[in-house]
Design a protein with these regions (language model features):
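Short, flexible loop/turn elements at secondary-structure junctions
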Residues: 94, 190-192, 202, 216, ...
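Carbohydrate-interacting/catalytic domains
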Residues: 1-39, 49-53, 63-122, 126-171, ...
Length: 802
């Protein structure tokens, strides 16, 4: 006698209602296979009805097996019993699509698959057979959950998110026809949610269909969906539907640890195998720790990928990651930069944010291609011997509802009080005091270093993290427990971030954009510092651009703005930035900031670059500066490459290339960039003539470079400076050379001409001077120079004789 088709069901009505209503927080207690003790009467019918029904069963029944499933779009659902290959139809016990099959003759679990027949979009039918997602055991290990809960899971992306995996058959202890099942393992942190579901085209975005299991130890929800359900794996669109416990909160969320997302304005996450790319940068990685030391040259080309170059013939579209690799790598290599720095490539919904309002902390933006495409981009730079630094934004995140904000119906990632709102950018501020949030951010940083082989991270808006009163008026903030304005939780996070990153990935660079005088930013945490490797020298940038924007007639009144930076140049490990922030929002381009007529504008820009490359500190130049772009930077259009048809713009580009070459090849210009032993004034008092001179020392003192700067358009004849050694001093670079668009004024004689084209009165080739045994400016020797207008001249002794 068969009882599969009987109208009697065993699932309690409240459980059926919870699943159908979308508020079931423990789906594994309801769905899937269950052994039911029918003697308890805890079924879908009363005890009396159950006893009456069981009286008709021709054998004793105390325990039975049920299989339950919820498929609201199914026309029929059946169970295939794998040990007998019997197909048993399931009974629809709720019109919304709750199905149940009761196996009265069985008392122990058995292997099975579900067969679901649904209507298709074209009016036909489609049938899928698969292992029940609710037949699989626990997915994440207890150790993983322990690390997540204590905030120390630094490979978080390997357990959370969506992963293509092959799991052992859920019936490995039975006679299962397969050893493993391929599919996608989903996991997300949402400790305060009532329910979290995986949704996508595979379940018509209905959050009731695939609710997840809650692992209360760490507040993580997990579910494995076989490939047969999903209709594939890689490239699959999905989101998490999060139902909160309070206020009827129901929201579709992108995966916080997703590796790939749709191009805005769409926002679904995309399943991607993050580990399949095969790298070809072993040589670079093996020597990275050596080439990224403080005593090595670091010259950075800052790039916004969406506007470096576009394709006007195709609707002004972006270049892809692979197209950028083909064009940008040889360009950066030719220009002599050692590194590029990318404005944030993490996924972000708003183009106007330039990438600084991130929703995908584990995903390169899909605007330019896939994660593998971006890996290929980084790989190409490494094979060319160029490092890649990524801008990374742990200070704040946007309020877009598909992102992190109010993720589980509570302030999960953000502070829930006044600290949670950023007054400048109208964004949310991470809760740096919560262990799981700190873990999320540290894991994100490590993700880019491990998975994408980034060589460093530049941390944006560090100052906004350090101070509780940042951009807040009195009454809008509260002091810390000591009565100060220091954000103690953020400071502790920054220190921990730098400690972990340097321990896990030796040799990478951590760079701070910190705009205040916070002490010891680039000192180790064990001596009280924040632990960064470098800090942007915003003071140098501000003072230098202010000085160069002045008419040369008035520069003598602002001489201190030029020289002040040397008072603190070695208090931190500095990078000198001429960044994207200085060429937008009405500030004008670098060329546009320069005073004077057309020739003087270009001469001033050449002098600015010469002074920057001569000044102690690593270098950073935003794209467009090297071609003397007239316009401010526009994120929505390409750089004005057509300007290179004019000699003046070619000259600036040629100068930047040669400055990089000189910086890389002359130890004096980089070995002691961050050490006071590498710099010594010759004379900084000549404010009346706006002339300064100094020595850049190398570790081998014989390789020193003397730098002389004339920041007026007046040629200074017979200008004497002291030098440390006798012998012949040769120009190794002069920003006034004609090949750069300058006047060609010779430092050693009369008339004009390019380097090496004429002979001066002394008999030396133009560009060379002989030191005289005439003490000057506390030096035993001196040279007599002709200083070209608006120029910076680099001199090096030709021989090592003393």
């Amino acid at each position: 006698m068969e009882f599969h088709g009987n109208p009697f069901y065993l699932t309690p009505p409240d459980q059926v209602a919870a699943v159908c209503g979308g508020y079931c927080s423990d789906p594994f207690a309801v769905l899937g296979m269950h052994v039911v003790d029918v003697g308890t009467g805890d079924t879908g019918h009363g005890a009396g009805e159950l006893a009456k029904f069981l009286s008709h069963v021709p054998y004793p029944v105390s325990r039975v097996v049920t299989v339950r499933a919820f498929y609201p779009f199914a026309e029929s659902v059946s169970v295939r019993v794998l040990d007998t290959n019997e197909v048993v139809p399931m009974q629809r016990i709720h019109p919304d699509g709750f199905f149940e099959a009761v196996f009265w003759e069985r008392s122990e679990p058995f292997p099975y698959r579900l067969i679901v027949t649904e209507g298709t979009r074209d009016g036909g039918q489609g049938t899928r057979e698969f292992y029940d997602p609710y037949s699989f055991p626990l997915l994440l290990s207890d150790f993983d959950l322990h690390l997540i809960a204590e905030g120390n899971h630094f490979r978080l992306w390997q357990v959370l998110g969506a992963h293509i995996v092959e799991l052992p058959s859920p019936f490995a202890n039975h006679q299962s026809p397969v050893a493993s099942v391929r599919g996608v393992r989903f996991a997300v942190w949402a400790p305060n949610a009532l329910r979290v579901s995986v949704v996508g085209d595979f379940n018509r975005w209905d959050g009731r269909v695939h609710p997840m299991r809650f692992r209360h130890e760490a507040g993580v929800w997990e579910l494995f969906l076989p490939e047969e359900i999903l209709g594939g794996t890689e490239g699959l669109l999905y989101k998490f539907e999060v139902k909160g416990r309070y206020g009827g909160y129901l929201q579709l969320k992108a995966d916080p640890v997703g590796f790939y997302h749709e191009v805005r304005p769409k926002s679904a996450s995309i399943v991607w195998d993050i580990g399949r790319y095969r790298w070809n940068d072993d040589e670079w990685l093996s020597r990275r720790q050596e080439v990224q030391r403080l005593d090595k040259p670091v010259s950075i080309y800052e790039v916004h990928l969406g506007s470096w170059r576009r394709v006007p013939e195709e609707g002004n579209r972006w270049l892809t990651y692979r197209e950028l690799a083909e064009q940008l790598v040889p360009y950066v290599k030719d220009m002599g930069f050692t590194h590029i720095e990318l404005l944030p490539v993490m996924e972000h919904p708003l183009d106007e944010s330039w990438g600084y309002q991130v929703t995908g902390y584990f995903a390169p933006t899909s605007r330019y291609g896939t994660p593998d495409d971006f890996k290929s981009f980084v790989d190409a730079f490494h094979q060319a011997g160029i490092g890649v630094i990524l801008d990374w934004v742990p200070a704040h995140f946007p309020k877009d509802m598909h992102g992190l904000v109010f993720f589980d119906g509570t302030n999960l990632y953000e502070y829930g009080d006044w600290r949670g709102d950023h007054p400048d950018w109208h964004t949310k501020v991470f809760n740096f005091g919560r262990t799981e949030v700190r873990n999320f951010l540290i894991a994100s940083a490590l993700f880019w270093l491990h998975e994408f082989h980034a060589d460093g991270l530049r941390i944006d808006a560090v100052a906004s993290m350090l101070y509780l009163d940042y951009s807040r008026k009195p009454g809008e903030w509260q002091p810390n427990i000591y009565g100060g304005n220091e954000h103690l939780e953020a400071i502790d996070f920054i220190k921990r971030l730098n400690e972990v990153v340097h321990e896990q990935v030796p040799g990478i660079l951590m760079v701070a954009e910190e705009s205040t005088a916070w002490p010891m930013v680039t000192r180790p945490t064990y001596v009280g510092g924040l632990g960064f490797d470098f800090k942007w020298n915003m003071g140098w940038m501000h003072d230098t651009l202010f000085y160069f924007s002045q008419d040369p007639i008035f520069r003598k009144y602002h001489h201190g703005a030029l020289t002040f930076s040397l008072w603190y140049a070695f208090s931190e490990n500095f990078i000198l930035p001429l960044s994207h922030d200085e060429v937008v929002h009405g500030k004008a381009s670098l060329l546009g900031k320069m005073p004077g007529d057309l020739w003087q504008k270009f001469a001033n820009l050449r002098a600015l670059f010469g002074y920057m490359w001569a000044h102690p500190g690593k270098k950073l130049l935003f794209m467009g500066g090297e071609i003397a772009q007239w316009r401010e930077w526009d994120y929505a259009s390409s750089l004005d490459w057509h300007l290179l048809q004019w000699e003046s713009h070619q000259g600036i580009q040629r100068l930047v290339r040669d400055l990089n070459w000189l910086y890389r090849t002359e130890p004096a210009l980089h070995e002691w960039d961050c050490d006071h032993r590498g710099f010594e004034w010759i004379d900084f008092h000549d404010a009346d003539h706006s002339v300064v001179s100094f020595i850049r020392w190398a570790k081998d003192w014989r390789d020193c470079i003397v730098v002389v700067c004339n920041f007026t358009p007046v040629v200074r004849h017979d200008y004497r400076i002291g030098v440390p050694f006798n012998g012949v001093w040769r120009e190794v670079l002069n920003t006034d050379w004609q090949q750069y668009g300058g006047s060609g004024t010779r430092v050693a004689g009369q008339g004009t001409g390019d380097k090496g084209q004429a002979t001066g009165e002394s008999g030396w080739e133009a560009g060379e001077v002989v030191a005289e045994a005439l003490p000057w400016q506390n030096r035993p020797y001196s040279v007599r120079l002709t200083l070209p207008p608006l120029s910076v001249v680099f001199l090096k002794r030709c021989t090592h004789t003393t």
